Curated annotation (Swiss-Prot):
Enzyme Commission code: 1.13.11.19
Natural source organism: Mus musculus
Keywords, ordered alphabetically: Dioxygenase, Iron, Metal-binding, Oxidoreductase
Disulfide bonds: none
Catalyzed reaction equations: cysteamine + O2 = hypotaurine + H(+); N-terminal L-cysteinyl-[protein] + O2 = N-terminal S-hydroxy-S-oxy-L-cysteinyl-[protein] + H(+)
Positions bound to Fe cation: H100, H102, H179
Name of the protein in its database record: 2-aminoethanethiol dioxygenase
Tissue occurrence: Ubiquitous, with highest expression in brain, heart and skeletal muscle (at protein level).
Gene: Ado
Chain's role: Plays a vital role in regulating thiol metabolism and preserving oxygen homeostasis by oxidizing the sulfur of cysteamine and N-terminal cysteine-containing proteins to their corresponding sulfinic acids using O2 as a cosubstrate. Catalyzes the oxidation of cysteamine (2-aminoethanethiol) to hypotaurine. Catalyzes the oxidation of the regulator of G-protein signaling 5 (RGS5). Also oxidizes proteins RGS4 and interleukin-32 (IL32).
Length: 256
């Protein structure tokens, strides 16, 4: 059963998100006044939320492989304004949300049940042009000529596992803006805030990427596991085996 104060908590989360991200959809330069303090308050509220508070029961693992007609990920819409969206993503066992970006957006992710592994990356700003791999650099698997022209430098900043006991994972327009989310050892779900929401007509479309690994000389110092480390990113279409469908949200309603 939800705690007695949870209806007010999810309402307070939405209200605090409104304060934190006010003006984020208007194209105004920089965050609103008091943004760091408001963001800290929002993180504190998100840290408290649990699956039972939203009337969401942890899902059981389904037999593998998943039937092809079942979406690997579903989404429960809770609330949305021009400034932010609030909802829950549910990942089936063994699935992931592929590496993708959030152009000009902030994001906050709080695990409700299960464990997710989040890999956070950024594209490296190279000014007016872009840096290409040197001609002698080889990749595994090899890149086609057009792919070689299209790859961009990036940085893999972190890779960590989050559970319901973890605080929220936060991304900004300039830090950890690309991420991949994998369900680890079973199904998982997380509460998600995006500010402002995706809007292709306003330049906030979702782009997918894959990491292409250079072949490293055996004598090269350091390990591929050392983070942060430079990577190469190739924009790709949405994977055929990934899609997301909606399902009803069973928890307390959020009012304007």
């Amino acid at each position: 059963m939800p705690r007695d104060n949870m209806a007010s908590l999810i309402q307070r989360i939405a209200r605090q998100a409104c304060l934190t991200f006010r003006g984020s959809s208007t194209g105004s330069e920089g965050p609103a006044p008091g943004f760091p303090e408001n963001l800290s308050l929002l993180k504190s509220l998100l840290t408290q939320v649990r699956a039972e508070d939203l009337n969401i029961a942890p899902r059981k693992a389904l037999p593998q492989p998943l039937p092809r007609n079942l979406p690997p990920v579903t989404y429960m819409h809770i609330y949305e304004t021009e400034g932010f969206s609030l909802g829950v993503f549910l990942l089936k066992s063994g699935t992931c949300i592929p590496l993708h970006d959030h152009p000009g957006m902030h994001g906050m992710l709080k695990v409700l049940y299960g464990t997710v592994r989040i890999s956070c990356m950024d594209k490296l700003d190279t000014g007016a042009g872009h840096r290409r791999p040197p001609p002698e650099q080889q990749f595994e698997p090899p890149l086609q000529p057009l792919e070689r022209e299209a790859v961009r430098p990036g940085v893999l900043r972190s890779r960590a596992e989050y559970t319901e006991a973890s605080g929220p994972c936060v991304l900004t327009p300039h830090r950890d803006n690309l991420h991949q989310i994998d369900a680890v050892d079973g199904p998982a779900a997380f509460l998600d805030i995006l500010a402002p929401p995706y809007d292709p007509e306003d330049g906030r479309d979702c782009h997918y990427y894959r990491v292409v690994e250079p072949i490293r000389p055996k004598e090269a110092s350091g390990s591929a596991c050392d983070l942060p480390r430079e990577v190469w990113l190739l924009e790709t279409p949405q994977a055929d085996d990934f899609w997301c469908e909606g399902e009803p949200y069973p928890g307390p309603k959020v009012l304007p």
